[in-house]
Amino acid sequence: MNCKKIIICIALGMAGFAANLSATEPATAIKSHKAVDAAAPNVYWTDANGQVSYNINAKTAPVVKIALNLFENDMKGVTGYAAKQKTTAPIQIFQLDLLSNKEFSSLEKLGAPVQKIITTKDAYFIGVRKKKLIVVGSNARGTAYAILELSKMAGVSPWSDWYDLKPQPRKSIFTPVDQQWIGIPRIEFRGLALNGSKWMNPQNYSRIARLMLRLKCNTLWQVAGKHDATYNKAVVDSFDICIADNYRVTEWTGKKHKKKHRKTLENVKMVCDNAEMPIENVAPGLVLDMLNNRDYLETKSERREKSHRHEAHNDEDCAWIANVTNPKKAPLQLAMMSDLAWNPYALKAGIRNYLQSWLNNLFGSIAGKKIQPLMEEYYRLTSIRQPAYMAMPYGDTEFHSGEFGNELERFLYNYDLLKTKTVNIEKTLPANQRDGFFEIVKYPIFSAALIAEKELEAQEARDIARPGLFQKDDEAKAAAAVSLSAYNTLKQLNAYYLRLGKGKWSNFITINGAEMQAPQLPGTLSANEIKRLKGEAFDRDQDLQPLVNFTKPIIAKNAYDYTSYTKAPAPKGQAAQEIELKPLLGHSNKAVKLPKGASLRYKFASSQIGDARFTLAVIPSYLSNAKNMRVSVSIDNAQPVVCQMKEDTSSKDGKFSIWRGQVLKSFYVTLLDGYHTIVIKALDDNVIIDQWALDFDVDREYYVFPVLK
């Protein structure tokens, strides 16, 4: 029996160990390895000229060659020289399933822990052995992932190509001899379900496939009646991508990649599985909750009882699929999903810290620290109203210019402040980061702001104008002028993006969506009228008064501003479930998830007397299998009022709730002045409280809860 066969037999005998390892260890674990040669603390990838070199086994799969090409170009961006292949190179790469006996023997002599990855698909090892950086993949994809992991270690973000980001130049690159990384996927099938992508051509599919490769995703998903994508076979084959059709995954296996292997999946987590809510229209905090919540598992047979899921489900046979229309619009959400699919501890420090680290990797720590507040405010404002939902098919939004000193203009003013901060930070960035900053930060912020201004000012013009008298109503015309000016600026912004990189993103920039169309106005204006009337419009800098001036008869709070809380009852022999704060989720940008039986308590004083309307806002439930999402509210120890917050997402009310990102329920109470208490309790699982308001003007209509900061 030859050496290679002996090792494989030993590895197969340790398959159980390897499976347990993938479930318990971080997927990309950094481990200490005792140095053999204390005089050589680092292994340098670069030679005296700064050029990186590598060597690889003789036979490799097409996807490995693609990864090597990307790596070579990545190193050119970092060092100024493309990486080159060299027999004596400091980086030695091995694709396990295509090694010759001689190559396998050489690898064995280097002491790499092959047994930890050999039986696991897509796994890899990177570490120093005998003064060489050893890179080993269990199969073609694992080898490709490991190669591109080297790019990440050198400072090249997986998103660099997609956002035209230049890595920081380095004269040398090295790895300490005591470091090693073992990557074992936690989720076997990880990928995308592309919606509305019939416009995609092979070149664009190739770009998406490259992104998937860098994110270590391996599956494109299609379910009849849900996803209309038709995938390009040549691209799929060359990138070794699995195709899933109606819960059956097909992949090519074997040394010559000619054997079809089909697997039926019972447990699948469809992230944002709704045609009207692709992942780019969902707050990062909610995406994270979906990823961490087993109740979002979907089964082929529709057997979704919890007992079935907990008994049958394990991560290794599960697929995570993100429903996405345009990957360029959801980089943070997709990055979170891909990282968690490999490492269950990837967001252990919290989503805000993850966002900070993600931005640091893109722009450097100094710029990243400045950009983070911009993105957090962007996620807050878009959680109040996503740009895609600004153009209303069922009439106007509920924004009301007559309440709280004009809440409509106050909302737009927050965008004005955000735009100003964005421009100021842009000026501080080096030229090689400007394009990436525009694509990741400035364009999302400015387009969201301009869409909001276009639609809300048009709504204001329609509300003000009397039938047939638009041309005689200067106030209505001024609002229309602001709307049209925003529309013209939006077109210029899109045109700039379409020209970026010689037009390489022209097919990815959506300029024909409802939110991009001309505003619906009660009349027309000439260019000269737009310019003149815009100067007569509501001046947000001068005309807006402090919100506190308008909130005497209303108490509004974010859910996280509680006085105290009560944990859920503890199951026998287990610890009580804690409440969870959910940053980057909700109008509050920090909603509170309550386990069943947990409650929040608020204490406050009010000088108001009489009837009041209490309104509770929770995050909509997207769980099709959940029948109830009940919350009880008790004011001043009165009999609790039970509110059913679960809605049919296909109903008109359900759509309104999705568009505003909140389900609202109200009831009336009569109160005296003095101190009051409110207790909000979850009666079912998956209850996420966002805000509440107690309004003594019971007929008031408004959209944004007037929470004082």
Where in this protein do the model-derived segments appear?
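Sec-dependent signal peptide recognition
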Residues: 2-9
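Bacterial N-terminal signal peptides
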Residues: 9-16
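Contiguous, structured surface segment used for ligand recognition
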Residues: 23-183
